[in-house]
Amino acid sequence: MILSNPTNPQSPQFRVLTDPQCAELYHAALECLQRVGIQVHNPAARNLLKRHGATMEDHIVRLPEKLVEQAIHTTPHEYTVWGRDDRYAMQVALDHVHFGPGPTCTYFVDPDTGERRKARRGDAGLTARVCDALPNIDYVMGLSLFDDVTPALSPVYEFAEELENTSKPIVAWANSPESFLDIYQMAIAVAGAESALREKPVFAYFTTYESPLKLANEPLANLMQAAERGIPSVCLGGPTVGLESPFTGASALTLYLASALGALTVVQLHVPGAPMAIGGLPSMMDLRTARPAYGSPEASLHGAAAADLARHLGLPFMGTAGASEAKRVDAQAGVEAALQVMLSALSGASLVHDVGFLDCADIGSLSYLVLADEIIGMTKRVMRGIEVNADTIMLDLIERVGPGGLFLNQARSASLCRKEAWVPSVLDRDPYNIWERKGSQTTEQALTAKLMRILGTHRPAPLAADAQKKISDILRLAEEREVKRQDG
């Protein structure tokens, strides 16, 4: 976790938007919701909004300002997502920055062969185990969309693997109300009781909205289910600039915020005070391919601006970093991750996801996750800033050693070396001859070596036997349900 900006005045200070700019964009989003409206494809959500004064035309709902403002007012400024081990409890609040992977990659880089293949069972477990070992990864998502299970149960199998392979908090997704309830029951099995899970939720629910201005049926149903059960949630999205919004950052931010506030309003009307974060990635359209460019500087800029808007409203925020257009872990991947991680930390985003994404979120890579962990470690050191006081200036020691002297043998100075100096675990600092003597290892080879050490030696804390059995039973019953559905 990184403390950023106002929470740590010693850290570098950074903002994209001024307070007046935030206010103008916020009021534009409110006006958009009132004049243009938002598609709401969940009947219960539409009825809820209508009962509270929204107007409706088919699936398009127009929200009064006061309704949205009340939703912002009732949303908690912070909440906690727990892991199986309380040491990893994650305070989700602005300027408390936590990093983790992303979900639903179609392809996965096989750690044994280094080749891209379809994601399959076991990949989320590998991801969770690596996250469990990496010191700068705070929570777990699966980096995979299983190709070899019943499609409706892909998120359920993923969550089961994650529970087994990490003690850190999990951010889970679901593709139906039934799969959400399967995941919820698994979490109860680990927590021990429904009341214990409500007190210390071991997962948060993640979903997305469609751009522009569209809230789909099942994500809204799951958001409402999560709120009823005290499970924190995140709703993330954002237009591809130039395709799903006009070609300006301001219009993209307006559409992002309007959509996010639409989802927030539904949740807060349903269960006032439900813990929820909004999230945004208004990414630039690549002018040659029309794909969203995750690694573009504009995506990082817009993400940081979206965090400024969340701070202006007092809402927890999910951003994006460690996601590249590169197809392998190469120089491009490193450049794009470094910019994203640094701007995410400076912006104070509460949760930062998609660490380990390659090829526009199509490939999950554990080696890239390891590289991002290194970059996050570097960024943490920058964000700690420079402590300035009489004890750190050490003028008395400077006077004692005098002009031309050295400080290496001064115990008072040397005792601070571990605190002041960041030491890499992958990046190379050896002189050329020593690097050559050690085998002339490239950065990609060093990342692979560290990854294989983790997979070969790290053993997460095991699940209790009764929890394992309950999870197996939930999977079996879910499969039986899906068979009946297909037969029926």
Residue ranges and their predicted role:
Residues 282, 302-325, 350-357, 364-365, ...:
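A glycine- and small/hydrophobic-rich beta-loop-beta segment
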Residues 119-346, 350:
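Helix-rich catalytic cores of soluble enzyme domains
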Residues 44-114:
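Glycine-rich, N-terminal phosphate-binding loop and its surrounding beta-alpha-beta segment
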Residues 39-46, 57-60, 138, 197-199, ...:
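Flexible, glycine/charged-enriched surface loops at secondary-structure junctions
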Residues 2-3, 22, 91-113, 312-324:
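N-terminal small/glycine-rich loop or linker at the start of catalytic domains
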Residues 2-4, 15-28, 36, 41-48, ...:
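Catalytic-core signal marking the mid-to-C-terminal active-site face
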Residues 10-14, 289-294, 322-329, 356-368:
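Short beta-alpha connecting loops at secondary-structure transitions
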